[in-house]
């Protein structure tokens, strides 16, 4: 329920995506499960099929929320319409250390057709064709195949169905060459955030000609006291900085007291770091309070995660 509220909060009226007119609107199916499984119940496909049938669209794009990309889908649609397959899949060439065992890697021939796929199991190659699980599919064909899947005793999630369809239909493979972060773990999430401190990666993701729409907060600028010391960090608005901050991503309405130190960390909104407290290699969720003199310290390969709303009164060191 919390995730659904967050989605509504960010979409708002849908105006930025052309979804607030008389002739267009958005449909949001309410399906949520705490259980991680490759199979689903009948409600899962009832929601998807209702959306597809109401859409009246010729083509459908399915997106995966585990990859961070800023992709121009118009280019993908153009190639899909030019090559005329029933399925087009987007892939990225990635080094093996950035791929996890839940990712699908593709076998692609010289004409950019998908010949096969398998879950990543490691190997000797340095670079693999990792599927982003972004697909463009002809809608009538997709409805037909999903109705077949929904009728099975144990229907699979959409991504698994689409992976197999890409092979069965010799899908066209579109290579994405821009910035991509494959967020498959806490460490990968941590790295993706701190990547934004590198200007080259930042401008690859937030390209000036390809806007990223999100919720806007009009607040006062962040205040930096004379006692503050800031190096290579990004701040949102509304914060008060009296301490030391370096190599960190800082959200809105954060309060760093004098004598506090934050480095190599991701700080969510409304966090308070008291006098003399130290935070290193940590992900600190919304509304956390770190008491005076307390140390929260993870490592580069194992950052500490502090739960939303926690009050930290004792050291947490890894």
Label the predicted regions.
Residues 1-195, 306:
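Unchanged
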Residues 140, 149-318:
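Left-handed beta-helix
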């Amino acid at each position: 329920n919390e995730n659904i509220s967050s989605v509504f909060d960010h979409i708002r009226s849908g105006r930025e995506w052309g979804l607030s007119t008389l002739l267009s609107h958005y449909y949001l199916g309410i399906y949520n499960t705490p259980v991680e499984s490759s199979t689903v119940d009948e409600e899962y496909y009832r929601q998807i099929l209702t959306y597809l049938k109401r859409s009246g669209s010729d083509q459908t794009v399915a997106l995966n929320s585990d990859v961070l990309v800023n992709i121009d889908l118009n280019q993908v649609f153009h190639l899909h319409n030019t090559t005329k397959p029933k399925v087009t899949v987007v892939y990225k060439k990635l080094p093996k250390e950035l791929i996890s065992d839940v990712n699908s890697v593709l076998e692609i021939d010289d004409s950019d057709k998908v010949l096969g796929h398998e879950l990543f199991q490691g190997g000797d190659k340095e670079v693999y064709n990792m599927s982003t699980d972004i697909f463009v599919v002809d809608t009538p064909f997709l409805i037909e195949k999903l109705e077949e899947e929904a009728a099975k005793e144990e229907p699979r999630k959409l991504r698994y169905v689409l992976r197999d369809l890409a092979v069965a239909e010799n899908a066209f493979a579109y290579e994405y060459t821009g910035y991509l972060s494959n967020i498959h773990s806490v460490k990968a999430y941590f790295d993706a955030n701190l990547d934004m401190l590198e200007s080259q990666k930042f401008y690859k993701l937030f390209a000036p000609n390809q806007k990223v729409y999100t919720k806007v907060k009009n607040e006062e600028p962040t205040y930096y006291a004379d006692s503050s010391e800031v190096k290579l960090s990004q701040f949102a608005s509304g914060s008060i900085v009296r301490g030391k901050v370096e190599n960190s991503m800082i959200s809105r309405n954060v309060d760093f007291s004098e004598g506090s130190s934050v480095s190599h960390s991701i700080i969510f909104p409304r966090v308070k770091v008291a006098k003399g407290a130290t935070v290193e290699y940590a992900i600190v969720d919304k509304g956390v309070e770190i008491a005076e003199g307390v140390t929260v310290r993870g490592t580069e390969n194992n950052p500490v995660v502090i739960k939303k709303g926690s009050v930290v009164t004792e050291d947490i060191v890894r």
